[in-house]
Amino acid sequence: MAEISGNGGDARDGAVVVNLKEEDEQQQQQQAIHKPLKKQDSLLSISVPFLQKLMAEVLGTYFLIFAGCAAVAVNTQHDKAVTLPGIAIVWGLTVMVLVYSLGHISGAHFNPAVTIAFASCGRFPLKQVPAYVISQVIGSTLAAATLRLLFGLDQDVCSGKHDVFVGTLPSGSNLQSFVIEFIITFYLMFVISGVATDNRAIGELAGLAVGSTVLLNVIIAGPVSGASMNPGRSLGPAMVYSCYRGLWIYIVSPIVGAVSGAWVYNMVRYTDKPLREITKSGSFLKTVRNGSSR
């Protein structure tokens, strides 16, 4: 009896083992089938929102450069009808409107210097900087191309012989333009850091504050350097019009000024948090940053 019961037990145990192996194989096959689908879904869930942000940066930069530079072109072609204060108002209002329209989608950078400054402080993912910068340059280039089609196709605008050029050129010395671009971009980024990244600030007023800062900077620096504050704003028209004179000023100075402005604000702001946690706070860009981290 002991042998029979033992054999029966072995047979039953063997059957159980076989069934378990079959179930394991079926589960592995199902996991192998569904695993690529889950991976694909996760990639789509990450890439689609990011592509939306890039599209927002392209469109926002396009509208910003188109509106601001169109004011410059109209003012030039129509006997200074817009005037310098008018041009400044157009730039400021355009920035304000676009911040409120697209800020909740992409953060409303529209400026490689702002993107790089945020990344240097840890408020923006470093790996997303190249895509953002490329999107901003694309938007600026498309806007400049549109304006060239609308306001003339002169071939020698860089020499100053023709009156339509929507880019930026130093009116004085290179040093003068470099310094003033550094100062106004520092000022702009300092304000952005205060109203758009500090939990204690009123984030809803970020667009108004940033737009007003741009308006003031254009009035101050417009006649001297063109008040770029934005490497993309200068690079797009420069490529479209093949005019690269003094372009290095408008690439280097705004980036250095923006990074300096962001870090100086982080140092002077009053907070009970340790220094390592300062860059974790935010208000206006809080949603965007959280979305990027997911």
UniProtKB/Swiss-Prot annotation:
<feature type="transmembrane region" description="Helical; Name=4">
    <location>
        <begin position="177"/>
        <end position="197"/>
    </location>
</feature>
<dbReference type="GO" id="GO:0080170">
    <property type="term" value="P:hydrogen peroxide transmembrane transport"/>
</dbReference>
<feature type="short sequence motif" description="NPA 2">
    <location>
        <begin position="230"/>
        <end position="232"/>
    </location>
</feature>
<dbReference type="GO" id="GO:0015700">
    <property type="term" value="P:arsenite transport"/>
</dbReference>
<dbReference type="GO" id="GO:0046685">
    <property type="term" value="P:response to arsenic-containing substance"/>
</dbReference>
<feature type="short sequence motif" description="NPA 1">
    <location>
        <begin position="111"/>
        <end position="113"/>
    </location>
</feature>
<keyword id="KW-0472">Membrane</keyword>
<dbReference type="InterPro" id="IPR034294">
    <property type="entry name" value="Aquaporin_transptr"/>
</dbReference>
<feature type="transmembrane region" description="Helical; Name=3">
    <location>
        <begin position="133"/>
        <end position="153"/>
    </location>
</feature>
<dbReference type="InterPro" id="IPR000425">
    <property type="entry name" value="MIP"/>
</dbReference>
<dbReference type="InterPro" id="IPR023271">
    <property type="entry name" value="Aquaporin-like"/>
</dbReference>
<keyword id="KW-0677">Repeat</keyword>
<dbReference type="InterPro" id="IPR022357">
    <property type="entry name" value="MIP_CS"/>
</dbReference>
<keyword id="KW-0813">Transport</keyword>
<keyword id="KW-0812">Transmembrane</keyword>
<feature type="transmembrane region" description="Helical; Name=5">
    <location>
        <begin position="201"/>
        <end position="221"/>
    </location>
</feature>
<comment type="similarity">
    <text>Belongs to the MIP/aquaporin (TC 1.A.8) family. NIP (TC 1.A.8.12) subfamily.</text>
</comment>
<dbReference type="Pfam" id="PF00230">
    <property type="entry name" value="MIP"/>
</dbReference>
<feature type="transmembrane region" description="Helical; Name=6">
    <location>
        <begin position="248"/>
        <end position="268"/>
    </location>
</feature>
<feature type="transmembrane region" description="Helical; Name=1">
    <location>
        <begin position="54"/>
        <end position="74"/>
    </location>
</feature>
<feature type="modified residue" description="Phosphoserine">
    <location>
        <position position="283"/>
    </location>
</feature>
<keyword id="KW-0007">Acetylation</keyword>
<comment type="function">
    <text>Water channel probably required to promote glycerol permeability and water transport across cell membranes.</text>
</comment>
<dbReference type="GO" id="GO:0015267">
    <property type="term" value="F:channel activity"/>
</dbReference>
<feature type="modified residue" description="N-acetylmethionine">
    <location>
        <position position="1"/>
    </location>
</feature>
<keyword id="KW-1133">Transmembrane helix</keyword>
<dbReference type="GO" id="GO:0005886">
    <property type="term" value="C:plasma membrane"/>
</dbReference>
<protein>
    <recommendedName>
        <fullName>Aquaporin NIP1-2</fullName>
    </recommendedName>
</protein>
<dbReference type="GO" id="GO:0015105">
    <property type="term" value="F:arsenite transmembrane transporter activity"/>
</dbReference>
<keyword id="KW-0597">Phosphoprotein</keyword>
<feature type="transmembrane region" description="Helical; Name=2">
    <location>
        <begin position="82"/>
        <end position="102"/>
    </location>
</feature>
